[in-house]
Amino acid sequence: MLSQIKREGNRVVMLVNRRYTARGKNLPSSPKKVRPIADNIRGKSYIKAIAVLCSMPNKGAKLLEKVVKSAASNAMYHNKNLSEDMIFVKIVMVDDGRRRKKIWPRARGRADRLVNRNCHIFVEVDEKKDIKG
């Protein structure tokens, strides 16, 4: 988080650039399946990212779309001057979530272990800054 210190008369005011984030925890999809989708939208504008995610048939794309929309909604709620055109996807992280382990009965009294994987998705969006040089 970046901050700037500004002096107003005798008072010192600290201006903080907010981080607009959203998290999805224990979402029912394997991180291995969601990471390639996350790589497609990282660094793109919000509108392009949503367009890409809507066009994908994957379950992970739908989960990622919800988290990205939530992060953008948080940004527009906390900063009333922001619009959808001014937002881009800054950080997307997909981590391992909780694993659900089950026993799967097999022939001749044996048993196999079935592991269902979940994932945590973290998305941070930021506003586009025009660089004038």
From Swiss-Prot:
Record protein name field: Large ribosomal subunit protein uL22
GO biological process: translation
Homology family: Belongs to the universal ribosomal protein uL22 family.
UniProt xrefs under InterPro entries: Ribosomal_uL22, Ribosomal_uL22_bac/chlpt-type, Ribosomal_uL22_bac/org-type, Ribosomal_uL22_CS, Ribosomal_uL22_sf
Record text on subunit structure and interactions: Part of the 50S ribosomal subunit.
Function of the protein: This protein binds specifically to 23S rRNA; its binding is stimulated by other ribosomal proteins, e.g. L4, L17, and L20. It is important during the early stages of 50S assembly. It makes multiple contacts with different domains of the 23S rRNA in the assembled 50S subunit and ribosome. The globular domain of the protein is located near the polypeptide exit tunnel on the outside of the subunit, while an extended beta-hairpin is found that lines the wall of the exit tunnel in the center of the 70S ribosome.
SUPFAM superfamilies, A to Z: Ribosomal protein L22 (SSF54843)
Domain of life assignment: Bacteria
